């Protein structure tokens, strides 16, 4: 390559680039606001050429200048953005044509030249790294008609000529695949904090809440919207949502996993899997560390779930009990100013508000039970809806074990038996709760046994209600059975550690499991009573509690039936009363009692005859007088059902256990105005 005149004949090889259609560079005027001259030729060189030292060219290629200089110089090509000059002559700013990118066809044999072009530099923007560290090789071939560019953001200009070229930014911004959003407020997450992806604000809020006092009170209905703009409006709902999405105190990450760390590790320090995707090691609150794909779909997570299932199967009973004990929710406070003496409305409102708070923590507790989240979503929902009141009552009994004669609903809400007299129909439920608590006190129930019974109630609540129909349902049912076996093994292990004989261990296991049927019976009573209070508008039920209550009442087992119960006919047959005993003022009273059936067992011996005379298989459900009563456990006085029927009287057919005279009397009762 020939050197320029006046220079050493053996300097570094130079590449001559000549401007197209322009005058001498020294004659160009500078417009105000423009950058200074991009490149000034050194002294002794022709001003028509621009020389580039050889380190910017491929040293392995020998360029022959006999074909003429390469017309490649242009501020736009070198990614220098400048504003258009409208008042300058057109000769000063020539339009960029395709000929500026490759030579004419007069040189078909020109060899290819490889240039190392760095990424385009945008002025007034900080460069994340030196451009020469990530240089890319681009080939310029004279025989091809492809457009040459230094990066993908370089756009071809049209042949008619456009004043300036738009160049996109080439900064190393984070891609969409690396973005995570806060599970609480849906803002951009800064990392994996307390078991979930969360932003710095929600992380700091949750940290303050678990370290200090979290006695937040929602001014509305505990259903405030928590998003990026309204996350500071209600601290109570924000903390509730933190627990709902799975934030937990033990879920501290073992290694920082933020965008910056993931991006830096992607450069070579980050481990990679065989598919080429980067892996990030995240601590999930357990001793075993797991690998999570940042960009992988859901299907590659199957080995992780399989390993998790194996880990559950190999878990010892001691470790299983430790896990479910750690999952126990904290103490929940009512945080209300209790005004005594209670009224029916105030006590029911306090009970429902506390139950609504406990339901939120119950869902989080269930998800922390090992293996529960592996069940199908339908099974998880059904299990919770079938046993929510049983779990609440078991927790109430456990808190009340050390307080004879009292029910400890929360540390700031304790009731004696006599205080329940203000609520109609709740005294029997209180007595049953106190009886169960007394039985736990006699057995000296241990905390390990309590958590096992609580998990057993959850997993056994909906086991025999339906049969699996699909392969997914069958698989979920098998997982549920294996999980229930783990709970039973844990309970047996907990009893064996008490130093009892084999016979005593067997008896204790039987006594504890028999109490579960008592808890379910109390739960059914409480469900009926709460439904009654809701129908009478004594208390307003809303939010999660309303959904749980509707799920139980709509199942057909807890709705009171309008048909007369078996005790009605038995009482009438044993104690006949003339219709004249009804006085005009008793209509309203009896109607009210029809809405709230008096609770209490009956000693009527005719009930056995009714069950024998009307088997379930021989009568349709709508004609049976026993099945609705057995479903609802309602006890209706014989004088009440006829006045509460309203428009139509129930149809009564003569049977072998009801005399004709009694049917005539009942007809008179119904038709009496």
From Swiss-Prot:
Abundant in the liver and testes, less abundant in the ovary and barely detectable in the muscle. The keyword Cell membrane does not apply. It comes from the Eukaryota. It is found in: Nucleus. Residues 316-552 form the NR LBD domain. Pfam families: ERbeta_N, Hormone_recep, zf-C4. Binds DNA as a homodimer. Can form a heterodimer with ER-alpha. Its main location: nucleus. Disulfide bonds: none annotated. This is Estrogen receptor beta. Residues 553-602 are annotated as: Disordered. GO terms for molecular function: hormone binding; nuclear estrogen receptor activity; sequence-specific DNA binding; steroid binding; zinc ion binding. The lineage of its organism: Eukaryota, Metazoa, Chordata, Craniata, Vertebrata. Residues 182-247 bind DNA. Belongs to the nuclear hormone receptor family. NR3 subfamily. Keywords: DNA-binding, Lipid-binding, Metal-binding, Nucleus, Receptor, Steroid-binding, Transcription, Transcription regulation, Zinc, Zinc-finger. The gene is esr2. Residues 554-566 have a biased composition (Low complexity). One of its GO terms (cellular component) is nucleus. InterPro entries: ER-beta-like_N, ER-beta/gamma, Est_rcpt/est-rel_rcp, NHR-like_dom_sf, Nucl_hrmn_rcpt_lig-bd, Nuclear_hormone_rcpt_NR3, Nuclear_hrmn_rcpt, Znf_hrmn_rcpt.
């Amino acid at each position: 390559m020939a050197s320029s005149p006046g220079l050493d004949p053996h300097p570094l090889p130079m590449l001559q680039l000549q401007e197209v259609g322009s005058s001498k560079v020294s004659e160009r005027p500078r417009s105000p606001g423009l950058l200074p001259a991009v490149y000034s030729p050194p002294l002794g060189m022709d001003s028509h050429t621009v020389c580039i030292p050889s380190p910017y060219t491929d040293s392995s290629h020998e360029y022959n200048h006999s074909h003429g200089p390469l017309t490649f110089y242009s501020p736009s090509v070198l990614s220098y953005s400048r504003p258009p000059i409208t008042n300058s002559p057109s000769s000063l700013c020539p339009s960029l044509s395709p000929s500026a990118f490759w030579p004419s066809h007069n040189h078909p044999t020109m060899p290819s030249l490889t240039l190392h072009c760095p990424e385009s530099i945008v002025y007034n923007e900080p460069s994340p790294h030196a451009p020469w560290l990530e240089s890319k090789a681009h080939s310029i071939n004279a025989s091809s008609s492809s457009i040459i560019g230094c990066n993908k953001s370089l756009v071809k200009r049209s042949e008619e000529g456009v004043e300036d070229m738009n160049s996109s930014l080439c900064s190393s911004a984070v891609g969409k695949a690396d973005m995570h959003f806060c599970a609480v407020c849906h803002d951009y997450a800064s990392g994996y904090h307390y078991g979930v992806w969360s932003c710095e604000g929600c992380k700091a809020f949750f940290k303050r809440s678990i370290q200090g006092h979290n006695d937040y009170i929602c001014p509305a209905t505990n259903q405030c919207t928590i998003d990026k703009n309204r996350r500071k409006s209600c601290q109570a709902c924000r903390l509730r949502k933190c627990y709902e999405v799975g934030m937990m105190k033990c879920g501290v990450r073992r290694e920082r996993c933020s965008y910056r760390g993931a991006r830096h590790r992607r450069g070579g320090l980050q481990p990679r899997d065989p598919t080429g995707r980067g892996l990030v090691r995240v601590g999930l609150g357990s001793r075993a560390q797991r690998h999570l794909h940042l960009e992988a779909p859901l299907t590659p997570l199957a080995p992780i779930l399989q390993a998790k299932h194996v880990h559950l199967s190999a878990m010892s009973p001691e470790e299983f009990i430790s896990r479910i004990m750690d999952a126990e929710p904290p103490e929940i406070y009512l945080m209300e100013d209790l005004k005594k003496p209670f009224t029916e409305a105030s006590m029911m409102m306090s009970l429902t508000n506390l139950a609504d708070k406990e339901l939120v923590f119950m869902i989080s507790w269930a998800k922390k039970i090992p293996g529960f989240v592996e069940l199908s979503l339908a099974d998880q929902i059904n299990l919770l809806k079938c046993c929510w009141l049983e779990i609440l009552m078991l927790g109430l009994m456990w808190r009340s074990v050390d307080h004879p004669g009292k029910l400890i609903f929360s540390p700031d809400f304790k009731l004696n038996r006599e205080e329940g007299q203000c609520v109609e129909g709740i005294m029997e439920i209180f007595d049953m709760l106190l009886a169960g608590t007394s039985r736990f006190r006699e057995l000296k129930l241990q905390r390990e046994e309590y958590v096992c019974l609580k998990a057993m109630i959850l997993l056994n609540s909906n086991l025999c209600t339906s049969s699996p129909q699909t392969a997914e349902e069958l698989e979920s049912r098998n997982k549920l059975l294996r999980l229930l076996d783990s709970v039973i093994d844990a309970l047996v292990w907990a009893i064996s550690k008490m130093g009892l004989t084999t016979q005593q261990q067997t008896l204790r296991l039987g006594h504890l499991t028999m109490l579960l049927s008592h808890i379910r019976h109390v739960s059914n009573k409480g469900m009926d009573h709460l439904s009654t209070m809701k129908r009478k508008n004594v208390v307003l039920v809303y939010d999660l509690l309303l959904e749980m209550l509707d799920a139980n009442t709509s199942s057909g087992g807890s709705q009171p039936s309008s048909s007369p119960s078996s005790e009605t006919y038995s009482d009438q047959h044993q104690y006949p009363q003339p219709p004249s005993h009804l006085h005009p003022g008793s209509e309203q009273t009896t109607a009210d009692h029809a809405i709230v059936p008096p609770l209490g067992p009956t000693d009527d011996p005719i009930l056995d005859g009714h069950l024998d005379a009307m088997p379930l298989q021989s009568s349709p459900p709508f004609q049976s007088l026993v099945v609705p009563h057995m479903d609802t456990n309602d006890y209706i006085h014989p004088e009440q059902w006829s006045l509460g029927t309203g428009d139509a009287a129930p149809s009564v057919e003569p049977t072998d256990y009801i005399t004709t005279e009694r049917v005539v009397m009942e007809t008179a009762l119904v038709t009496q105005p």
